[in-house]
């Protein structure tokens, strides 16, 4: 049975409302659970929003990885084995814990800065709680913090930019390309376009594609932005560091074409795209680093040694 107009519009509204508010996930895990020393740190975003994070030192190392996170998550991951986060994405009702990622990086010889994006974790709120359009300023703030801190200012920098964090990093490269001078490389799991995810949602519920106009109208009225303004493939044209993308191929939230377009639009030769096969769980893309880290450590080592 086809959905009614009212049902389609209500579903669109629920998606659009998430751009202005969601259930904040608590920080469930800390680096000391993996035997890692760490400092609680804070620094301003480029526009002044206070950001909270961890600095995880690796003694005698002159290399640092700056890590951010997907939407709904924070620097520690997400407790999606618990209510209400187990309802975010059907089939992804298992916890994602990012602390093992930081342990792998530390043991491979990297300092780590992991921070919460604005409106997530313990970081401050900005832009009336708006998601998706200003996190690029947080990326710039993290770079300024590392370059301004006495014990990290001369370190080689690599980026671990996950999902919304990848979107934000690509957007920052468009807005402030000069800020990435000297950044050695990036790994970027699962960037995602608003247009792709909304189109897939409409298709799965059997709604005509013409409802994209209604989705765009609702998004604009809620956020002052259009769907086309949240487009990693467009921002990828400004990517200026070696970039390793990876993505669950059968992710039901998007299409392979979206991430393929991000890859295709990166204008430099030093790029790579890895498809994760055998699963349709988006969250498996976020735990893939800790399951199969060697290829990513090789990428970092190639550009940071």
Residues covered by each model-derived region:
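Alpha/beta-hydrolase active-site loop
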Residues: 97-107, 117, 128-150
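Short beta-strand/loop motif that positions the catalytic acidic residue
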Residues: 238-240, 245-247, 251
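Short alpha-helix in the alpha/beta-hydrolase fold that links the catalytic acid
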Residues: 241, 255-264
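C-terminal catalytic histidine-bearing segment of alpha/beta-hydrolase fold enzymes
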Residues: 260, 264-305
């Amino acid at each position: 049975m086809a959905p009614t107009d009212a049902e389609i519009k209500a579903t669109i509204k629920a998606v659009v409302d998430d751009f202005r508010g969601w259930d904040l996930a608590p920080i469930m895990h800390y680096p000391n659970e993996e035997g890692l020393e760490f400092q609680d740190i804070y620094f301003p975003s480029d526009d002044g929003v206070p950001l909270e994070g961890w600095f995880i030192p690796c003694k005698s190392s002159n290399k640092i990885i700056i890590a951010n996170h997907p939407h709904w998550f924070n620097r520690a991951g997400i407790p999606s084995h618990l209510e209400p986060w187990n309802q975010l994405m059907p089939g992804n009702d298992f916890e994602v814990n990012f602390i093992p990622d930081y342990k792998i990086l530390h043991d491979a010889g990297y300092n780590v800065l992991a921070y919460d994006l604005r409106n997530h974790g313990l970081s401050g709120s900005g832009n009336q709680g708006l998601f998706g359009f200003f996190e690029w300023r947080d990326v710039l703030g993290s770079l300024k913090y590392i370059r301004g801190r006495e014990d990290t200012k001369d370190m080689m920098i690599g980026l671990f930019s996950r999902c919304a964090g990848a979107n934000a990093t690509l957007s920052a490269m468009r807005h402030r390309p000069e800020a990435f001078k000297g950044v050695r490389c990036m790994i970027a799991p699962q960037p995602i376009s608003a247009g792709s995810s909304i189109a897939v949602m409409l298709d799965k519920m059997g709604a005509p594609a013409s409802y994209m106009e209604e989705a765009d109208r609702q998004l604009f009225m809620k956020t002052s932005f259009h769907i086309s303004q949240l487009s990693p493939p467009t921002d990828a044209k400004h990517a200026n560091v070696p970039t390793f993308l990876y993505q669950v191929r059968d992710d039901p939230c998007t299409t392979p074409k979206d991430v393929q377009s991000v890859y295709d639009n990166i204008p430099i030769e030093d790029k790579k795209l890895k498809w994760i096969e055998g699963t349709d769980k988006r969250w498996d893309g976020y735990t893939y680093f800790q399951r199969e880290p060697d290829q990513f450590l090789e990428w970092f080592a190639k550009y940071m040694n």
